[in-house]
Amino acid sequence: MPDDRFQHWIDASSAAGVIEPFMIPLVQGLGRFDCHLIHEDVRFSALNHEQSSSLRESRLLTDRVTLSYFWVLGAYELVRTLDQRWRTGATTLPDGFANRVAALKRRMERLRIPITKMETARRFPTDNPIAYPTISRGFGIAWHIAQDTYITRRELSDQLLDFLVDLKKGQTSKRL
């Protein structure tokens, strides 16, 4: 597990905890799974064709795709809740963060709808109704959502982690 990355998740979890204390273990759990998935993606990419085609690797790939699927669902619900709390006035966000959380929610929603409902997201009518999983050599598990358009779990996790790290900085500077 990339320890530095996991430490960033631990540190950033307090930003979500300001909004809802239960979000702290949720963010930390997402971070732990994120680091595990990155480790497994890196390990898999180092295998030769024969090794990557084994029955064991097929099972491990199924596990990675499934865990990535659940990671996306959990992360989406976290982001959706942050966005909803801000929109209903239940919490405040530092300047500029409301737009960032809304943009991240839309990005995640573009993937979440076809992987859960198996239909096209209304905002993206030309997308595929089903997002088929694939492997991006540089980023691990990805989903093909439209012609020439893929969303990787790693891309979403990087964006969520960056958002939370920056949110924590924004909350800290607001208090000073």
Regions found by a protein language model. Name each.
Residues 1-107, 138-176:
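Amphipathic alpha-helical interface segments
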Residues 99-140:
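Histidine-centered, metal-coordinating catalytic motifs and their short helical/loop contexts
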